[in-house]
């Protein structure tokens, strides 16, 4: 297959999804799921008994209306009980598997496929640690063929969905005609700490539960979804400690840490990654018709918009997902892709950029074409 003819841009060695392979991976279907209960930011402030005006301001100025969460049990004295780490790990397992199964079902339905068609399952999570991994638990829960190959990406954070897509795109190119799925399942409710500090308040104001699945396949010209052309990665090693999920000795549990400078760090480096992504393709930034950016938070999205010269329309799905769900971690860009797909505004030949950001600090991007 002459890939340069099918993509409309000159294929260079750098542009190959996997050097030496001629098959191009396409998106075949997408599905999402959330946990059972949602709350407005005001409701959460009341439920958690938050009175500090600075913390209340963080919640109310987040550009988030609602989030889906599984809150801790009620405290008879007011607020919610602090859950021990063991209970949080149990919560992660239960919620991540439940949401993951439902997102996978929706994804396969979108792709016109069944569980028996699935040949590779790559599961992504950073909100809990499981051995056996999430992929094994979902294969057992759904009765997927035990011969299905699988992989798990754990602990890479909000950028990990694109890392997984990179892996599965390579697998797909090597297995034309076979269906692979990237499944991100993040039970952010299982990663909360309630200690009244500003550090945890920022996290507690931002993240929500969500799962997203993307089916991909190569070698099938009947699939109408966009093709994956190229990936670019960048790790800002000077900011390796700026986003962390590590052990809090005072809380006796894992907890998130987000440096206030993160939006500016991400924004300042976004152009570097876009330029590398488009290098050798003959494309300019103005040729990109669709931007699907991780809903990392209001300030992060604003920094990306300013530094890449995007419009609010360009990131309408990003801000819409943030408003309706909060930061869903690794799968949030797929929630945005699902909304773009439902709009039915893409046309053959259109280019899109997927962008995720996370710990490292890391920026991941992918170039796609309809």
UniProtKB/Swiss-Prot annotation:
Q: Which reaction does it catalyse?
A: 4 malonyl-CoA + 4 H(+) = (3,5-dihydroxyphenyl)acetyl-CoA + 4 CO2 + 3 CoA + H2O
Do you know which SUPFAM superfamilies this protein is assigned to? Thiolase-like
What keywords sit in the KW lines? Antibiotic biosynthesis, Transferase
Q: Which Gene3D superfamilies match?
A: 3.40.47.10
What CDD domains is this protein classified in?
CHS_like (cd00831)
Q: So, what pathway does this thing act in?
A: Antibiotic biosynthesis; vancomycin biosynthesis
Q: Which InterPro entries match?
A: Chalcone/stilbene_synt_C, Chalcone/stilbene_synt_N, DPA-CoA_Synthase, Polyketide_synthase_type-III, Thiolase-like
Q: Which Pfam families match?
A: Chal_sti_synt_C, Chal_sti_synt_N
GO biological process annotation, one example? polyketide biosynthetic process
Where in the sequence is the active site?
A: 158
User: What GO MF terms are annotated?
Assistant: acyltransferase activity, transferring groups other than amino-acyl groups
Q: Give the E.C. number(s).
A: 2.3.1.246
Q: Which PANTHER family does the entry link to? A: HYDROXYMETHYLGLUTARYL-COA SYNTHASE, TYPE III POLYKETIDE SYNTHASE A
Membership in a protein family = Belongs to the thiolase-like superfamily. Chalcone/stilbene synthases family.
Question: What's this chain's function?
Answer: Involved in the biosynthesis of the nonproteinogenic amino acid monomer (S)-3,5-dihydroxyphenylglycine (Dpg) responsible of the production of vancomycin and teicoplanin antibiotics. Catalyzes the Claisen condensation of four molecules of malonyl-CoA to yield 3,5-dihydroxyphenylacetyl-CoA (DPA-CoA) and three free coenzyme A (CoA). DpgA requires the presence of the dehydratases DpgB and DpgD to facilitate the aromatization of the DPA-S-DgpA or DPA-S-CoA intermediate.
Q: Please report the name of this protein according to its UniProt entry.
A: 3,5-dihydroxyphenylacetyl-CoA synthase
Q: Which species is listed as the source?
A: Amycolatopsis orientalis
Highest classification ranks of the organism = Bacteria, Bacillati, Actinomycetota, Actinomycetes, Pseudonocardiales
């Amino acid at each position: 297959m002459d890939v340069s003819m099918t993509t409309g841009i000159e294929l260079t060695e750098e542009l190959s999804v996997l050097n030496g392979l001629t098959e191009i991976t396409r998106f075949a279907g997408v599905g999402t799921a959330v946990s059972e209960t949602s709350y407005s930011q005001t409701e959460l402030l009341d439920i958690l008994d938050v009175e500090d005006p600075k913390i209340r301001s963080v919640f109310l100025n987040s550009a988030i209306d609602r989030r889906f969460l599984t809150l801790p049990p009620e405290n008879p004295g007011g607020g919610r009980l602090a859950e021990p780490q063991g209970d949080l790990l149990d919560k992660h397992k239960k919620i991540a598997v439940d949401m993951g199964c439902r997102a996978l079902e929706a994804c396969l339905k979108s792709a016109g496929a069944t569980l028996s068609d699935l040949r590779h399952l790559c599961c992504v999570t950073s909100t809990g640690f499981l051995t056996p991994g999430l992929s094994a638990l979902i294969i057992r829960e759904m009765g997927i063929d035990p011969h299905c190959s699988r992989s798990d990406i754990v602990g890479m954070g909000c950028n990990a969905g694109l890392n997984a897509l990179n892996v599965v795109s390579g697998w797909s190119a090597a297995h034309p005609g076979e269906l692979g799925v990237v499944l991100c399942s993040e039970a952010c409710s299982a990663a909360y700490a309630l200690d009244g500090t500003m550090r945890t308040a920022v996290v507690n104001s931002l993240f929500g539960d969500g799962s997203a699945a993307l089916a991909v396949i190569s070698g099938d010209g009947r699939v109408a979804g966009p093709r994956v052309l190229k990936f670019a990665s960048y790790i800002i090693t000077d900011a390796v400690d700026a986003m962390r999920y590590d052990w809090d000795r005072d809380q006796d549990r894992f907890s998130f840490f987000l440096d206030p400078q993160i939006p500016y760090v991400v924004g300042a480096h976004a152009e570097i990654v876009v330029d590398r992504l488009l290098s050798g393709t003959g494309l300019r930034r103005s040729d990109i018709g669709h931007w699907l950016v991780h809903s990392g938070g209001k300030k992060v999205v604003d920094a990306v918009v300013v530094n890449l010269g995007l419009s609010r329309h360009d990131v309408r799905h990003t801000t819409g997902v943030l408003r309706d769900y909060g930061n869903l971690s690794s799968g949030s860009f797929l929630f945005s892709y699902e909304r773009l797909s439902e709009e039915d505004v893409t046309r053959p030949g259109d280019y899109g950029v997927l962008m995720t950001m996370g710990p490292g600090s890391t920026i991941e991007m992918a170039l796609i074409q309809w």
